Amino acid sequence: MSDRLEDSALMLRYRDGDVAAFEVLYGRHKDSVYRYLLRLALDAQVAEDVFQEAWSRIIRARDQYRPTARFSTYLFRIAHNCFIDHVRRNRRHAGAEELDAEKMPATDDEPDRVTERLLARERLGVALMNLPPEQRDVFLLREEAGLTLDEIASVTGTSRETAKSRLRYAVGKLGTAIAGNGQAPKRQSGESTA
């Protein structure tokens, strides 16, 4: 066994009172969970609020934790549910914040390359905002969280085939949008969000 303890073993240790085990888990997963929520919520304040709530739920529910799935699946399910709860409470959420070029890290790349990357990132952000929420969620669970289709299905409460279909539609729409003008095709009335 490697020196790196499995996440589920760390959570079990935390359940038994080992706070240092929780600190390791938090350190491993905080960035990916926050990125997932930020891209899902499209609002930094909402993402931060939901992020805090998700970790609070992990802490409060530690005595009930059972390692029936990967810890990351458990964690992203809680984060997903916290976001859904937030949306239900607020019935709306704001759009993404504008990219601030001054916050971007400096690079030694040629200015044209930097500009090209910034524009591509902006097109991706716009395209993500234009995806139906179900497709955006599945895409982010795959790309940000690195979950498998089975894990995505578990997190979203859908079948594997539904998760696969939503991912396929999302990737197709994002590819079209990034190659084109940055706008994901708008849904037609009656179009499935599969």
Spell out what each predicted region is.
Residues 1-32, 129, 151, 190-194:
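N-terminal module of bacterial RNA polymerase sigma factors
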Residues 2-3, 13, 42, 94, ...:
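C-terminal edge and immediately downstream basic/flexible tail or linker adjoining helix-turn-helix-like DNA-binding
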Residues 26-44, 61, 128, 173, ...:
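Amphipathic, Lys/Arg- and hydrophobic-enriched alpha-helical face
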Residues 15-16, 39-42, 53-70, 89-90:
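Sigma70-family region 2
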Residues 15-24, 34-53, 160:
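Short, charged helix-capping/linker segments at alpha-helix termini
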Residues 33, 37, 62, 75, ...:
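Hydrophobic-face residues of short alpha-helical interaction/recognition segments
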Residues 73, 80, 84, 135, ...:
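DNA-recognition helix of helix-turn-helix
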Residues 86-107, 115, 183-187:
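Short, basic/polar amphipathic helix motif occurring as a linker/hinge flanking DNA-binding modules
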